[in-house]
Amino acid sequence: MEKVIELNPDIMPMRIALANRYFEAFDYSSALPHFMYVAENSNDIDLKSLSLSQIGWMVYESGDVNTSLNYINEALRISPKSLLAETYKGIILIQQTDTRDEGILILNSLRNNPSLSEEDLSIIEEILEIYES
């Protein structure tokens, strides 16, 4: 698929599909250039927000909370209703002692969102159970 993307670099949904495949396999070094390309070159707000959210999560996984939140906040600035960005933000904030209450508020508000998948709801509820007790 890399060859196809190389020949068609601006087909953003295809690039996102490949980046997400890498992301889900925790191959962040392969996912990052594709998400960065979309974040920098796409005019599609949803794809740009998704890319920024995924970049933010990868940065968080590398241990840089502040930079990760910068990416996620930018994703929310351009797409305020992004469930992915909001979920990542809540998960990151709940794990930090000084922002735990804000994280709990975010994740509790997401619980009631009918657009949230059952799988994501289950993850959020597990996280809340850990930090609310």
Predicted feature locations:
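Residue-level recognition of tetratricopeptide repeat
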Residues: 11, 82, 116-117
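Single-residue signature of alpha-solenoid repeat helices
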Residues: 31, 68, 102-103
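Canonical tetratricopeptide repeat
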Residues: 17, 51-54, 88, 123-127
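TPR alpha-solenoid repeat register
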Residues: 14, 48-51, 85, 120
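Residue-level detector of the short coil/turn that links helix A to helix B
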Residues: 26, 63, 97-98
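Conserved structural position within tetratricopeptide repeats
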Residues: 2-6, 40-43, 73-77, 112
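Terminal, low-structured helical/coil segments at or just beyond the last alpha-helical repeat
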Residues: 98-133
